[in-house]
Swiss-Prot record:
Belongs to the TRAFAC class translation factor GTPase superfamily. Classic translation factor GTPase family. LepA subfamily. InterPro entries: EF-4, EFG_III/V, EFG_V-like, EFTu-like_2, LepA_C_sf, LepA_CTD, LepA_IV, P-loop_NTPase. SUPFAM superfamilies: EF-G C-terminal domain-like (SSF54980), P-loop containing nucleoside triphosphate hydrolases (SSF52540), Translation proteins (SSF50447). It is found in: Cell inner membrane. This is Elongation factor 4. CDD domains: EF4_II (cd03699), EF4_III (cd16260), LepA (cd01890), lepA_C (cd03709). It is a peripheral membrane protein. It comes from Porphyromonas gingivalis (strain ATCC BAA-308 / W83). Its main location: membrane. Gene3D superfamilies: 3.30.70.240, Elongation factor 4, C-terminal domain, Elongation Factor G (Translational Gtpase), domain 3, P-loop containing nucleotide triphosphate hydrolases, Translation factors. The gene is lepA.
Length: 595
C-alpha cells in the first residue's frame, strides 16, 4: 500500500491534460507503440473530436524509481463546468493533483474552481506549466500567477510539454516523492468510493472505485449504501489500458467491479460499496444526487420514432446517469420527452450522441430551468416546462434559480463584460485582481438568462480570453411572465417561454421578427403575435403568396376583374381557416440565438 500513488489532473479545457496523460502512459510503458493514439483516455469519438473529456477515466501505471516499484493510478477528470460533480468525486478518490496551466493562456476560471475543490480535500498540488514549446508561451508570467495563487516556490513548478515530452520524468518523480500514499486501514470494514461507471453491452454496468478501507475480493457479497441494493462481485480487478481481473483489490488501490447490474441508476457516482456480512458504519461523506439544471423538450421528427427515441434515451442513460427524461406531449410537435441536463454542453452532447450512435433526428425546444411556483394557498410546485404553469390568478409568486458566477478576464474587457452581466439581470458581488492585468469578477445571475447564449457572448466580447465558471447559489423571487407565441391566433406551445417582465416586450418583438424571417410564406396571410396572457405585445405579418388572377382579362368590363378578385379573396379566407402553419426546426433553434 505504501507504494501506491493516486493522483488526478486539474486543468481548464484545452490546456493539454489529455496529451500530457498520453506522455505519462508512454513513459511508464503502459501503452506500447501499437495502442498509441492521441488522447488514449478519451475513448468516445465525440470526446476526441471536441477535444474535451466528458467521462472520468482511470488508468494504472507501473513506475520504478531508485530500485523501488510504484503503482500510479491516474484518475482523469472532465474539465467542463457542467460535469463538476464528477470532478469532485474523482478528486475525492485521490491524494494528489497535477495542476496543469497552459503557458500561453495562464490560469482560467475552471482551473481555479477545481483547484479549490482539491485543496478542500487536502490533496498535494504539483504545479505544472504545460505547452512551454509554443512560440507564444510566457512561462515566467504564468509561474507568477501560480505562485500568487498557491503561495509555492518557483523551484516547485515543473515546466513541461505534452507534445515534446519535456518534463515528464520530473513529473513522475514528483508524484512519487510528494504525493502521500493512501491512508486506509486494511483490516477495517470495506469502504469503496465509486467515482465513475461505464456501460458495457455484454456485462452491464461496470463501476470504477477506490478502496478507502478494507479490501474487496472476487465473489464477495457487497452492498451499495445509497441505493441499498446487494450484489455479488462476479469480477474485480484493476484498470490498465483494458480491465485486468484480479482475485482481490487491496486498500488504497483503484479498481473496477462487475456484478451484472443492468441500469446506471443503481450505480451512483459518489456512493459507497461495503460488505453485507461486515458492513461499514457509515458511507463516505460527500455523496449527493445529481440534479439536472436545464430542461428541454426532445421530440422525434417522425412521430413513429417515439419508441425508438425512448429506447435510445434509455441506452444513453445507462452511460450517463445525470440525464433524466419523462414523456410529454405538445400540440405542435406531438409526443416526445422532457429531458433534464446538467448544462448546455451536456445538452449538446446528448443531442450529438443521439444523432451519432442511434441515428435519431430530433427537434429540441427552447431550454429552460426549473422554477419554484408558490400558489396562494401556500403550496409549492417545481415547474420544468412553461406550459405546466398555473393560471396567473392562482400564482402568489415565482422563484427562479440564481447562480454565483466567476468570470476571469483581462482588465481591458471589464466594461463590456459588466454590461453583458447587467443586461442579464446580474448583481455584482465583488471583484478581485489576480495579477496586474487579470481580474476575477463574481456575479449573481439568474440561471435562466445564462442558459441560452451567455457563454457565446462572453467569449466574443472578450475575444475568447474570458473564462467562466458557476455553481448554483439559491432561489430568489422574480417577476416572471409566460410569453406565448400565436400563429393565426393559435398558441404554439413549443415556443412558450418564461421571461422577466422588464425584458418581455423586447423579447416578444425580437421573437416575432425572427419567426417572420424563418417561416416560409404560405398562400394565406400569417399573423405572428407575442402575448402575455390575453394581452398582445407584438405582431408581425407574413404576406401571402398570390396568383395574378386578372392576368387573362384584357380591358373590358371592370366587374369581370372584380368578380375574379372577390373569388380569390373568398378562397384565401377559407384557406386561412383550415390551413396550418408549418414551423421549421430552424425556427426553434433561432429562438435560442436571439441577438
Amino acid at each position: 500500500m505504501k507504494n501506491i500513488r493516486n493522483f488526478c489532473i486539474i486543468a481548464h479545457i484545452d490546456h493539454g491534460k489529455s496529451t500530457l496523460a498520453d506522455r505519462l502512459l508512454e513513459y511508464t510503458n503502459t501503452v506500447s507503440g501499437k495502442d498509441l493514439q492521441d488522447q488514449v483516455l478519451d475513448n468516445m469519438d465525440l470526446e476526441r473530436e471536441r477535444g474535451i473529456t466528458i467521462k472520468s477515466h482511470a488508468i494504472q501505471m507501473d513506475y520504478e524509481m531508485d530500485g523501488e516499484k510504484y503503482v500510479l493510478n491516474l484518475i482523469d477528470t472532465p474539465g467542463h463546468v457542467d460535469f463538476s460533480y464528477e470532478v469532485s468525486r474523482s478528486i475525492a478518490a485521490c491524494e494528489g493533483a497535477l495542476l496543469i496551466v497552459d503557458a500561453a493562456q495562464g490560469i482560467q476560471a475552471q482551473t481555479i474552481s477545481n483547484l479549490y475543490m482539491a485543496i478542500e480535500n487536502d490533496l498535494t498540488i504539483i504545479p505544472i506549466v504545460n505547452k512551454v514549446d509554443l512560440p507564444s508561451a510566457m512561462p515566467e508570467e504564468v509561474e507568477d500567477q501560480i505562485i500568487e495563487l498557491l503561495g509555492c516556490d518557483r523551484s516547485e513548478i515543473i515546466r513541461a510539454s505534452g507534445k515534446t515530452g519535456q518534463g515528464v520524468d520530473q513529473i513522475l518523480r514528483a508524484i512519487v516523492e510528494q504525493v502521500p500514499a493512501p491512508a486506509g486501514d486494511p483490516d477495517a470494514p470495506l469502504q469503496c468510493l465509486i467515482f465513475d461507471s461505464v456501460f458495457n453491452p455484454f456485462r452491464g454496468i461496470i463501476a470504477y472505485f477506490k478502496v478507502v478501507n478494507g479490501s474487496i475480493r472476487k465473489g464477495d457479497h457487497v452492498k451499495f449504501i445509497a441505493t441499498e441494493k446487494e450484489y455479488d462481485a462476479d469480477e474485480v480487478g484493476v484498470l490498465r489500458l483494458d480491465m485486468e481481473p484480479r482475485s482481490e483489490v487491496k486498500t488504497g488501490d483503484v479498481g473496477y467491479i462487475i456484478s451484472g447490474i443492468k441500469t446506471s441508476r443503481e450505480v451512483k457516482v459518489g456512493d459507497t460499496i461495503t460488505h453485507v456480512a461486515k458492513p461499514a458504519k457509515e458511507a463516505i461523506a460527500g455523496f449527493e444526487e445529481v440534479k439536472p439544471m436545464v430542461f428541454a423538450g426532445v421530440y422525434p421528427i417522425e412521430a413513429e420514432d417515439f419508441e425508438n427515441l425512448r429506447a435510445s434515451l434509455e441506452k444513453l442513460q445507462l452511460n450517463d446517469a445525470s440525464l433524466t427524461f419523462q414523456p410529454e406531449s405538445s400540440v405542435a410537435l406531438g409526443f416526445g420527452f422532457r429531458c433534464g441536463f446538467l448544462g448546455l454542453l451536456h445538452m449538446e452532447i446528448v443531442q450529438e450522441r443521439l444523432d451519432r450512435e442511434f441515428n435519431m433526428n430530433v427537434i429540441t425546444t427552447v431550454p429552460n430551468v426549473s422554477y419554484k411556483v408558490y400558489d396562494k394557498k401556500g403550496g409549492c410546485k417545481e415547474v420544468h416546462n412553461p406550459s405546466g404553469l398555473l393560471e396567473p390568478t392562482l400564482i402568489d409568486h415565482i422563484e427562479e434559480p440564481f447562480i454565483r458566477a466567476s468570470v476571469i478576464t483581462n482588465t481591458a474587457y471589464i466594461g463590456p463584460i459588466m454590461t453583458l452581466c447587467l443586461g442579464k439581470r446580474g448583481v455584482l458581488v465583488k471583484q478581485e485582481y489576480i495579477s496586474g492585468d487579470r481580474v476575477e469578477i463574481f456575479y449573481d445571475l439568474p440561471l435562466g438568462e445564462i442558459v441560452i447564449d451567455f457563454y457565446d457572448k462572453l467569449k466574443s466580447i472578450s475575444k475568447g480570453y474570458a473564462s467562466f465558471d458557476y455553481h448554483l447559489h439559491d432561489f430568489r423571487e422574480s417577476k416572471l411572465v409566460k410569453l406565448d407565441i400565436l400563429l393565426n391566433g393559435e398558441p404554439v406551445d413549443a415556443l412558450s417561454t418564461l421571461t422577466h417582465v422588464d425584458n418581455s416586450v423586447t423579447f416578444g418583438r425580437r421573437m416575432c421578427e425572427k419567426l417572420k424571417e424563418l417561416i416560409p410564406r404560405q398562400q394565406f396571410e400569417i399573423a405572428i403575435q407575442a402575448a402575455i396572457g390575453a394581452k398582445i405585445i407584438a405582431r408581425e405579418t407574413i404576406k401571402p403568396v398570390r396568383k395574378d388572377v386578372t392576368a387573362k382579362c384584357y380591358g373590358g368590363d371592370i366587374s369581370r376583374k372584380r368578380k375574379l378578385l372577390e373569388k380569390q379573396k373568398e378562397g384565401k379566407k377559407r384557406m386561412k381557416q383550415i390551413g396550418t402553419v408549418e414551423v421549421p426546426q430552424k425556427a426553434f433553434l433561432a429562438v435560442l440565438k436571439l441577438d
